[in-house]
Design a protein with these regions (language model features):
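Bacterial N-terminal signal peptides
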Residues: 19-33
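Boundary at the C-terminal end of the N-terminal hydrophobic targeting segment
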Residues: 34-38
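Surface-exposed interaction patches
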Residues: 215, 240-241, 265-266, 573, ...
Length: 630
């Protein structure tokens, strides 16, 4: 697998017409130290002891910005509360006023996002229920059985369908676009569901005007992670994102928590749908077996029962439970543990193993109706543990589904949850090691507003720690953030985002495929090493060089005509466009050393005047540590 990945990366370098691998390694080793440690001091001369900066009140409103310049504050907001600036965004925010822009992002329903919705119409799976997805994209074994063929025959038919789909792609004459459409056409069956969901996720990050909403959707999915490749979850994740996460990104935390707890995707992923009172379950199984024997006419006298008579099958439809394959089904602690450790209280939240068991018992009966046919949440009182349960010192004895709902509300409003969620917010939006003063302020707001997500975010954004010099460019972009921000910076037109989603996966963050419930790490140490940096440089060079399938990049429009023949001018222009001219001297020296590379200036047969390879320069700048940070 590693060899195959290396070959893919090298092909990307060759396709981009980039520097030699040795040159790239030299760049990587030069900028790796800058990536590994926060670096907020740039060539603009910002020092830790700098005097307070006074910004126009009309621009900043009540935002407590005293250490960042106007341009820095705008870039900071666009990078932290969104996926970075597109050309023209900085001036647009400046004209609007930063506080007004922030307030607008905190209220996404006030923002017209119809252009994005039009773009998403091409994805046929996004608005389908889990049942319809199962009907339209059934598992291979089920589809083969339905068609009356063997699994091998069905596989052969699918391969032919993929070939037919590729042949039916209407070629546009644009090699990049045609290749991407052909790649997408090959994805048939259930894999199409996750492919379209992934492409739509990237479309939202790149093209949505509701940038903070897109960030929060990603944050909450990562927080309440499910693994799409676990059995039936592949058909349930679309609904999980659309119906559970997205509508609640800035509402009450307890509403989001309960919605995820009732989601078939979460119930299936953490096995709570199988959790049952062992004694009640065995009793129910015995009753089902006895009922089945009666229905089959297995009596001492051998006489089959008559329809509509006592002991015989009813003449109308019934809701008889299906036979369970696992006769030893009992209490499952997975969700009871993770809802405390990962979703609410945190690992040091003050709960015990007995609390985990009690929470699992409170949530027995929270299950899924036919997960591989028509997955819907329902509460099955027959397998619920009845009786008094004590979780975190609180007794639950209402009975039925209410016990679970009350227990989840208790966890959602616990002081440890306020601290844990506030820490997660601050780590994502401010720094890997956020100030305790900020966390305490956010946690206090969390408790006073009963977990109002929008209010907690506003408290964070309107805190001086958010706008501090230490927080500026202190976060390393995860692969998803890097890919989205690069597409935005290049003002790229990406009709088919599949190649971009593939790059996110190649750099270590495949969408919806994080197997452990922890989700992907938000800390730099996970993403910073020489191998990862080479992959990031490779991506930037391939994308900026116009060689990435499914993308259109017009660097001439971005750079302007003046950079055409002077590599130094082109570099300065790239630094200004992509980094607002804010770059450390060590980075500038490293980049300028590459300007002597023969690939930088090239002549064509029809034009002896050497032209700057703008794609290579742009790619190197986009691979710089300042752009890799947000």
């Amino acid at each position: 697998m590693r060899s195959r990945q290396s070959n893919k990366d090298q092909r990307g370098l060759d396709a981009a017409g980039a520097c030699s691998l040795a040159a790239l390694l030299s760049v990587a080793f030069c900028i790796l130290p800058a990536m590994a440690t926060p670096s907020s001091n740039v060539e603009s001369g910002a020092e830790q002891s700098q005097p307070s900066i006074h910004l126009d009140k009309k621009f900043k409103g009540n935002l407590p910005i005293t250490e960042l310049t106007e341009d820095e504050a705008i870039l900071h907001a666009l990078d932290r509360l969104g996926y970075g600036p597109r050309p023209g965004d900085v001036e647009r925010v400046r004209r609007m006023g930063l506080e007004k822009w922030v307030d607008q992002q905190l209220h996404p329903d006030s923002i017209d996002d119809s252009a994005l919705e039009t773009r998403l119409e091409k994805y046929s799976t996004l608005n389908l229920s889990s049942k319809k997805l199962l009907d339209r994209y059934p598992p291979p074994e089920q589809a083969a059985k339905k068609e009356g063929v063997t699994k091998a025959e069905f596989k052969s038919e699918q391969q032919q369908k993929r070939r037919d789909a590729v042949e039916q792609v209407a070629l546009t004459g644009n090699d990049n676009l045609d290749r991407a459409q052909q790649q997408l056409a090959k994805i048939q069956g259930p894999n199409r569901i996750i492919a379209e969901l992934s492409m739509a996720k990237l479309d939202r990050a790149v093209y949505s005007q509701r940038q903070l909403e897109a960030v929060m959707e990603d944050f909450w999915f990562n927080h309440f992670n499910v693994f799409a490749n676990k059995g039936a979850d592949k058909w349930m994740v679309t609904s999980y994102v659309r119906d559970t996460i997205r509508p609640r990104t800035m509402g009450k935390f307890q509403d989001l928590l309960i919605a995820t707890a009732k989601s078939p995707a979460m119930l299936f992923y953490l096995d709570n749908w199988l959790s049952a009172d062992p004694i009640a379950y065995q009793r129910m199984q015995a009753e089902i077996a006895a009922r089945r024997r009666r229905y089959q006419g297995i009596f001492v006298n051998g006489a089959p029962p008559q329809p509509g008579t006592f002991g015989g099958p009813p003449s109308g439809p019934t809701n008889r439970p299906a036979a369970q394959k696992n006769p030893d089904r009992g209490l499952n602690e997975n969700y009871g543990r993770e809802v405390m450790e990962l979703h609410t209280l945190g690992v040091d939240g003050g709960y015990t193993q007995q609390d985990v068991i009690a929470m699992a018992e409170v949530l027995t009966g929270w299950t899924v109706h036919e997960p591989r046919k028509d997955p819907e949440f329902f509460f099955d009182d027959r397998i619920h543990v009845h009786g008094k349960e004590v979780v975190m010192g609180r007794t639950f004895n209402s009975g039925g589904i209410k016990d679970g709902e009350e227990a989840l509300r208790m966890l959602a409003n616990h002081p440890s949850t306020a601290k844990f969620i506030s820490t997660e917010f601050a780590r994502h939006f401010v720094s890997d090691n956020p100030p305790q003063t900020l966390i305490d302020r956010m946690a206090q707001n969390f408790q006073s507003t009963n977990g109002d997500i929008r209010s907690v975010l506003k408290t964070m954004i309107f805190s001086p720690e958010f706008w501090s010099r230490e927080a500026y460019r202190a976060k390393v972009k995860r692969p998803f953030e890097l890919v989205a921000s690069t597409a935005r910076a290049l003002d790229a037109d990406v009709p088919v985002t599949l190649p971009l989603t593939n790059w996110v996966g190649r750099m270590g963050e495949p969408f919806f495929l994080c197997q452990p419930p922890t989700g992907y790490s938000d800390k730099a140490e996970t993403w910073v090493n020489t191998g990862a940096l080479l992959s990031r440089l490779n991506f930037a060079l391939t994308f900026a060089g116009g060689k990435l399938a499914g993308t259109n990049v017009n660097l001439a429009a971005v750079f302007g005509p003046e950079a055409g023949t002077d590599p130094h001018q082109a570099l300065n222009r790239a630094l200004e466009i992509f980094l607002d001219g804010q770059v450390a001297q060590t980075t500038r020296d490293t980049l300028e050393a590459r300007l002597s590379d023969p690939q930088i200036l090239q002549a064509r047969l029809d034009d002896p005047v050497k032209q700057v390879n703008e794609g290579l320069i742009a790619g190197l700048v986009l691979g710089a540590p300042e752009f890799q940070r947000r």
